[in-house]
UniProtKB/Swiss-Prot annotation:
Organism listed in the record: Buchnera aphidicola subsp. Acyrthosiphon pisum (strain APS) (Acyrthosiphon pisum symbiotic bacterium)
Similarity remark: Belongs to the HscB family.
GO molecular function, one term: protein-folding chaperone binding
Purpose: Co-chaperone involved in the maturation of iron-sulfur cluster-containing proteins. Seems to help targeting proteins to be folded toward HscA.
UniProt xrefs under SUPFAM superfamilies: Chaperone J-domain, HSC20 (HSCB), C-terminal oligomerisation domain
Record-given protein name: Co-chaperone protein HscB
Annotated gene: hscB
One protein family per Pfam: HSCB_C
Amino acid sequence: MNYFTLFDLPRKFNIDKKLLSQNFYKLQLKFHPDLFINDSESKKKIILEKSIQINKGYKTLKNFLNRAIYFLCLNGYEVKKETLLLKNNDFLIRYFSLYEQLDNLKENNFNKKELNNLEQIIQKKIIYCKKKIELEFEKTRYKKVIKIISELLFFEKIKDVLKKEYNIYLSQIN
């Protein structure tokens, strides 16, 4: 089942998130397993599967990155998050310095000014990647979208590593 069809949305990358949520809750009310407790086991099984499909579809379309990968899949491109970065060596070489900045932050006990600066750099890159992905989807340049998704994954990963390392640092000083 196509998730765009399931939630009665046009099949395009940019979606109306409010409409997605409204349609999700309508479907949940219609197919919630608790509403079918007195039905046959086979009917309960069908309803449970439909409810799982609704939840999975909602999570997929609500999340920017998951929606991008799903939309690519619908258009004939198989994308695996695990291998995307390996195919973009030039990008990795260019932005590996962000990991060096992270190491410097750790060595300097997470200097607040440096921390804020690095967070801003990463956040700006994430926003830029998302805007580029939206633009490239509009132009149906799917191979470019895949490349930019790999970059977005890199920035999201370093953002998570920064957050994790900073939390470790905070737990050690408290």
